[in-house]
Amino acid sequence: MVAVLTWALALLSAFATVQTQKGFWDYFSQSSGDKSKVARVQQQKLIWEPTSLKDSLEQDLSNMDKFLEKLGPLSGQGREPPGLPHDPEGMRQQLQEELAEVRARLEPYMAEAHQQVGWNLEGLRRQLKPYTVELMEQVARRVQELQEQLRVVGEGTKAQLLGGVDEARGLLQELQTRVVQHTGRVGELFHPYAQRLVTGIGRHVQELHRSVAPHAAASSARLSRCVQTLSRKLTLKAEALHARIQQNLDRLREELSAFARAGAGGAEEGANPDPQMLPQEVRQRLQAFRHDTFLQIADFTRAIDQETEEVQLQLAPPPPGHSAFAPELLQADSSEARSKLQARLEDLWEDINDSLHDRGLSHLEEP
């Protein structure tokens, strides 16, 4: 419950930052004189048992009073719950003071939760790093193997290449055959590594779920959704990476095959192929394949960092004073910022609802 409260206070700070606090209190003031509107809002938002619903604003204020009273032990000092003023402006000022006081006491909890969740997400990144490192090592190794396997023009074959049309055409046709054969084999060798990456993502993200649960400010339901979303995103990105590597191989095969066909066609027309051009072309194409694939693997690694950082902000945002706290909400008069703030408030409502529901069930189970 402390984690949920901390998140609530953080978002109230964001309210002030994006200049929406006044509209919130205007709405609250109007609602104070309209009990039927309060009842409608409660019917739309509250999903716990009907017996726990309070239909009057006076009871809501009483609950707020008890809520503030329960915060007293956090400072180690018991105190009487403050009386709430009847005028909305006085209520606004008093609640602001209470929130500022409570936020100051709870910020250490929020900072610790943010740090703990971040540490667990960093653990996930460390666990996935060997998969990408292994993939890059395999790319480098397979490129070297391809270069050896496609080395059809050596000291012993230069004379064959220059010996006549038939010899040159036969050598270039052999190159075409080798290109198709060995690039296909490399594609098959990459598949198990890509599959291990996908499997590793699923396993390590589930381990993350268990390790981060005690520290997250989110409800268990929202935590599960965040973890499932992270697993799905990373899995899709890993599958897309495998598809791009295969596309790189297909392009390499097509380019080398086209070069060999062009050389064979020139040989038939009587042109003698340059013995140095063929190995140079093979080497350049292989280096381009290696370079492009390395960049794509690096992009995938950065995507892991980005997705895990986003999850950290969702599950355990930093304290309001932290530079990473809700940076997208600092754009005043921005419809996008208001939309994101609304989404976070809806998440907050779900967390509070689940926490109160769980507390209610625990009280019912007490003898």
UniProtKB/Swiss-Prot annotation:
Q: Does the keyword Transport apply?
A: yes
Phosphoserine: which positions carry it? 56
The family database entries (Pfam families) matched by this protein are listed as: Apolipoprotein (PF01442)
Q: What is its main location?
A: secreted
The record ties this protein, via Gene3D superfamilies, to:
Apolipoprotein
What happens to this protein after translation, modification-wise? Phosphorylated by FAM20C in the extracellular medium.
**Which intervals of the chain are annotated as region Disordered?**
71-90
Segment forming the signal sequence: 1-20
Instruction: Give a GO molecular function annotation for the protein.
Output: phospholipid binding
Query: Which UniProt key words apply to this protein?
Result: Chylomicron, Coiled coil, Endosome, Golgi apparatus, HDL, Lipid transport, Phosphoprotein, Secreted, Signal, Transport, VLDL
Superkingdom of the source?
Answer: Eukaryota
Q: Does the keyword Magnesium apply?
A: no
A GO BP term, please? cholesterol efflux
Q: Name one GO cellular component term.
A: early endosome
Q: Give the UniProt subcellular location, in the record's own words.
A: Secreted; Early endosome; Late endosome; Golgi apparatus, trans-Golgi network
Q: How does it assemble?
A: Interacts with GPIHBP1. Interacts with SORL1; this interaction leads to APOA5 internalization and sorting either to lysosomes and degradation, or to the trans-Golgi network.
Q: Please state which protein family the record places this protein in.
A: Belongs to the apolipoprotein A1/A4/E family.
Q: What does this protein do?
A: Minor apolipoprotein mainly associated with HDL and to a lesser extent with VLDL. May also be associated with chylomicrons. Important determinant of plasma triglyceride (TG) levels by both being a potent stimulator of apo-CII lipoprotein lipase (LPL) TG hydrolysis and an inhibitor of the hepatic VLDL-TG production rate (without affecting the VLDL-apoB production rate). Activates poorly lecithin:cholesterol acyltransferase (LCAT) and does not enhance efflux of cholesterol from macrophages. Binds heparin.
Protein name as annotated: Apolipoprotein A-V
Q: Which gene encodes it?
A: APOA5
